[in-house]
Amino acid sequence: MTAFIKKLLSPVVELRDSEVGTSLMMFSYSFLVMTAYTALKPVTRSKFIADMSAENLPLVQFAFGLVVGFLMQGYSAIVGRLPRRWAMPITLGGLAAMLVGFWLWFQSGSQWASTGFYFFGLILGILVISQFWTLANEVYDPRQAKRIFGFIGGGSSLGGIAGSYLTLQAKAIGTTNLLLVSAALIGLCLMLVSAIIGRERPEIKGSLTGGEDEGVGAGEALKLLKSSRHLQTIAMIIGFAAIGAAIIEQQLNMATAASKGAGNTDSITSFLGQVQLYTSIIGFVIQVWLTSKIQRYLGIGFALMILPTSLGLTGTLMLINGALWVPGLARVLDTSLRYTIDKTTREILFLPLPNDLKQQVKPFVDVTVDRFSKGIGALIVLVLINKTWGLGLGWQQLSWASLGMTGLWILAALRARREYRAIFRKSLDQQVVEPQSLRLSDADLSTVETLVEEQGHPNPRHVVYAIDMLESLDKRHLISPLLLSHDSPDVRARALATFLLVGVSNQPA
């Protein structure tokens, strides 16, 4: 049976006999937990809109940004008292029980149930994703991770599609009953995780909260951020992405409430699920077929421009056309691009930084700056739409804020492109990037072009370093055969080793 499964999966992933069972369970875990989460996400919005109105969503989002750190610290304190290996199964059991509890609360007709459930949904999104990858990093060593992570992570993509499809059935199932469906799915995850832990017996050392496992404190991270203009630019880009997403999400929520009727919960759930389904499918297609090609052939500068350009174009379209499909399209494009092309491109921006600096400040920039910016985005939206003390703008008029954000974002992207090239060139001179730390996704056009040019450097040490880097990026075909005739014996030896490795040792000397 194991041999059959290996052969069946061979076009997708290369598995050893001992890895088949655990990898299938990890794939199933990622699929089920993401199905449960994505099925609930539209429900959190639709229930809140029905009970508290779409205009109050930014208020609860801003409040969540203020308290999320305290909530996660409280959770960490609780699970810290539990046996580390069993913290995940106990957490999953608690989440399933809370979903049943919220289902019962909704039966009482309390409006506050919607607010509590919205908070719960935001926390759930943090926990389920971080816990899955924490377990994956403990089960697999780095060599296994390179082979297997793409496969088990694929379960999340399929789960996003399956969960979104579930929400399309809200009218048949009932919006509130989707909580019971998700509780059952999380119950299955509990059994899978228990089986994986019993089989592999991993030592769970990573964070269970999606927080900053590594790096320095916030104060020290801010000092490092102030000392690096490039880091400041990365933080600005992350901030603009979060604020732009907050504006688009609010436009979609307000437009849906106006079109479907704020009290029509099942219709709102179904429509938001439809938007989420398109987002999952298009995001999957972009990640698999477009992301690497855009970075490889068009470069990091072009990739950085895609998301702000999308924000500006859809913002303009919303000013012209008030149909519901327009904010739906804006949300699909924003989310699918943000978590594919834009996210991987931002990762490349960190590439030329020294590893110690990267490890110290990257968690702060990725997590804290993003959460802070989401809070700022919610506050901006609140000021723009509040009819009592704010500007009282409608959902279409919010696009003026998007257009202003687009201009600032494009300026930051142009600056990031210039700084990246300068810092990457400097990092080559100082050789601060470890070739073995590179990933294939780091191979954007600008990076590869610079490394190819580096083969002509008069210093042999630089040439050898460029060969190491190209080899790590799986770009051996770009290593010049002329290096076999280089004046330096070190360069000749390194080039020969590479050509022998790829079976072209007959290159002319």
Where are these regions (language model features)?
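C-terminal ends and interior cores of transmembrane alpha-helices
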Residues: 93-111, 291, 307-323
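Structural detector for internal amphipathic alpha-helices that build alpha-solenoid repeat scaffolds
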Residues: 435-441, 461-472, 481, 492-504
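Substrate-agnostic recognition of the 12-TM MFS/MFS-like secondary transporter fold
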Residues: 22-75, 113-168, 213-224, 229, ...
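Amphipathic alpha-helical scaffolding segments comprising HEAT/armadillo-like alpha-solenoid repeats
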Residues: 445-454, 473-485, 504-509
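C-terminal transmembrane helical hairpin of 12-TM major facilitator-type secondary transporters
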Residues: 302-341
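Intracellular loop-helix junctions on the cytosolic face of multi-pass helical membrane proteins
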Residues: 1-24, 54-58, 81-86, 93-96, ...
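Short inter-helical turns and helix N-cap capping residues of alpha-solenoid HEAT/ARM repeat scaffolds
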Residues: 456-459, 486-490
